[in-house]
Amino acid sequence: MKKPENVDQLLSALDHPLNDAVSTLRKIILDTDPNIAEQVKWNSPSYYYTGEMAPFDPKEYKRDIVVVNLHKKDSILLVFPTGARINDPSGLLEGKFTDGRKVIKFASSEEVKTHLVDLKNVVRNWIETIEKDV
């Protein structure tokens, strides 16, 4: 199978029981801020910040907001590579990884819709942590 060039191609070829939830998550994340774009990274939908930022080492993944891990058929795992820096009063973010990542696990479209506001707040709070070069 040919490697997908963009998220549309990736999702159109996706055979996952939670396709509807993936589409809902995509819309929620992209609608949260006009400076969020998407790409295929690590063979998954990935969302990153396109706005102004202070210079940084690309290996720090400071532009990467969230990667959608679709490797399990019974759930979707949102991986925030720098999630430890996010203020999350809702408690939606989980994990104590030494590399600073945090995750959110969804098992259904209904669960995604239930946490829509909290997820948008997590993404907004991530954007607030950005060191801007102004």
Feature locations, PLM:
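Charge-dense, helix-prone N-terminal extensions
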Residues: 1-134
